[in-house]
Structures are given as structure tokens and as C-alpha cells.
Amino acid sequence: MRVRLAKEDVNSNYKVSLIDVSREKDFVKILEDYNIKYKRTEYFKDLFMYKLIDINSKFIMILQEKASNYIKYIEPVSIYSLPLQIEDEDGEIPVVYPEENKDYVTLGVIDNGIAHIKHLDPWIKRVHTRFLREETSTTHGTFVSGIALYGDKLENREIVKNEPFYLLDATVLSATTIEEDDLLKNIALAIEENHKRVKIWNLSLSVRLGIEEDTFSDFGVVLDHLQKTYGVLIFKSAGNGGNFMKQLPKGKL
């Protein structure tokens, strides 16, 4: 049983993976005996997680005593986030419009929404969201979509040399942060409902935890499963750290 505790051992939400699923009822009984609130999320067959709400090392010690032989690991739930601030720069570039009777690929933007500004509105083909518009800020998704469509023009040089494309706004979070289980369910729903028309997806959310040296994360496993199940490609950002602003060496992925 691998254990990783939250910083300063404050009460936090933890995720638990079982190595022996036949003991699931025993595990649930322990949770209920100690009045622990929990949420079970099944991503696909044979991959599910338990999220234990608001616990600390005291209850984790109980799990080590009573269930260490069938728990694979317990660790804080990963929290994915967006930049809190995006710098504005003055300038203007011409609006690009779709040509009539021309087919364009559609890019799925998995983010916090895309604002219907004049540069992007002609290209937004569809909006997939579980949130009310007033609940979303559309800051980061708009930023990402603008770079995707106008990147070469903003740089005033050819870097990507790509053709324009339609956008599918896949809004998967309403605030600036979201816990891993909720995020993955939202991503899965967006791809499940739109995979026939959208084969390329961009995912530029961040997580503050470093990668493991010898194992794949649950997040990566679920994304791979979605790619194989629905025949899509998901492009995930990595290494977007801030060390360069402090003139420090590159950090670990």
C-alpha cells in the first residue's frame, strides 16, 4: 500500500485505488463504520476510484491497519487548474473567416469555454457544456483558441503553417480549478458525445504534481482509453512551469 499525504497533513480529499477488487465490499464497510463520506467513480470497466472526503492521516492509519493488503495506493486527489491571470497586449490583427463551400477540420478545445469574440465566433461550430454561460469565465479557452487559430499571425512569422479549422467548445470546468474525478468524467462525456465529428482535441489544463518515474498516472490511463475507444487524438500540454521567469533551471515534468 503506497501512501502520500497532503502537505502539513491538513484535511483533504484523497483517492484510493484497490489492488484486489473482490475486497471492495470490505473497503466500503470500513468507510461506513467510520462515517467517512466517499464518492465512487468508474471511468471504464476495471478502472474505478474512491474519493474519500475530508480525511487526514488519522484515518489513513486505520486503512493501513485494516486494508493495506488490498489497497494499491492512497494519495491526495489531484487538482487541475488554469492560469489565474493572462496578460493583455495591445495590437490588432485581421479577422479570418471560413471560405464558403470549403471543408475544415474541427478542433475540440477542452477548457473553460470560448468567448464569442469577433475573431473566433465565425469558427465556433458547436458548444458542449454542462454549465450555464454565466458560470464560466471563458478566459483560458479563448486564449488557447486564439493561439491555435491565429498563432502564426500573432507571431508575424510562419511556425505551424496550419490551415484554419472549426472549433468545438468543450467546457469541462466552470471555475479555475477542478478535482481529477470530476474533470475526467466531464472530458469523457464531451468526447463520447462528439467523437464522430471531432477527432483532434486540445487539453491545456495544469496539475501541480510531478510525474512518477515508473508508472502511468490514472489521468493518462483514462485519456489513452478514450483515444483508443473513440479513435481520437488528445494533445496534452506538459512542462508549462514558471522557472524560466525566475531564471532557474527547467523543473521536472
Task: Briefly describe each language-model feature range.
Residues 1-97:
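Autoinhibitory propeptides
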Residues 10-13, 100-107, 163-165:
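A short, charged/proline- and glycine-enriched loop
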Residues 26, 173-253:
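Substrate-binding/access-modulating region of protease and related hydrolase catalytic domains
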Residues 92-132, 147:
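Acidic-leg catalytic submotif of subtilisin-like serine proteases
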Residues 110-117, 145-163, 189-194:
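Flexible, small-residue-rich helix->loop connector segments that border functional cores
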Residues 131-143:
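Gly/Ser-rich catalytic serine loop of serine hydrolases
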Residues 148, 154-176, 199-204:
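Short helix-loop-beta-strand segments that form the rim/entrance of peptidase-like active sites
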